[in-house]
């Protein structure tokens, strides 16, 4: 499941599974959300992303999340998907971390590749027709799954974002819940 992916545009190394808690491995589970099939639900309390399947099932993935003050929650739509995306940090991030200026929109962003923070795939979250600037995306830093350390996006292991990317069509509803699954 987390083997090397040598046929990718940028060959992806295997995940050292000793650095990832087994509870975050991708697996088919009973749907705890009650949402319609095709809906993505992020449980920020447990660090899980669910892709709701038919017949009361869900594909569950472990995720990494934004640190306090950088998270997003609410309802939106996956409006766009990209393989090996270019990363362009938002102006607010560049203001906090001026060394990222070289990756600004004006400078063309960071080229796709294994060191790109968006990893192998990105799914773009829109709300009310506008890009939220939040993404579901891969990460080469798989040891951060289950932690809140990023600038707000939902990160998955590259192998998992590739699996999710194949399963999700656009547009698809997404719900990012900041509390227990029984509340929105």
PLM segments and residue spans:
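N-terminal pre-domains immediately preceding structured catalytic cores
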Residues: 1-184
């Amino acid at each position: 499941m987390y083997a090397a992916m040598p046929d990718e545009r940028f060959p992806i190394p295997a995940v050292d599974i000793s650095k990832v808690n087994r509870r975050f491995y991708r697996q088919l589970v009973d749907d705890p959300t009650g949402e319609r099939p095709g809906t993505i639900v992020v449980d920020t309390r447990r660090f899980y992303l669910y892709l709701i399947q038919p017949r009361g099932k869900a594909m569950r993935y472990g995720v990494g999340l934004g640190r306090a003050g950088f998270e997003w929650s609410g309802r939106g739509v996956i409006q766009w998907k990209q393989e090996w995306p270019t990363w362009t940090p938002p102006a607010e991030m560049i203001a906090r971390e001026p060394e990222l200026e070289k990756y600004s929109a004006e400078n063309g962003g960071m080229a796709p590749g294994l060191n790109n923070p968006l990893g192998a795939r990105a799914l773009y979250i829109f709300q009310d027709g506008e890009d939220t600037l939040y993404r579901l995306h891969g990460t080469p830093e798989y040891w951060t799954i289950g932690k809140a350390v990023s600038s707000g996006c939902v990160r998955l292991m590259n192998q998992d974002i590739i699996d999710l990317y194949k399963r999700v069509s656009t547009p698809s509803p997404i719900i990012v819940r900041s509390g227990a699954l029984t509340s929105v």
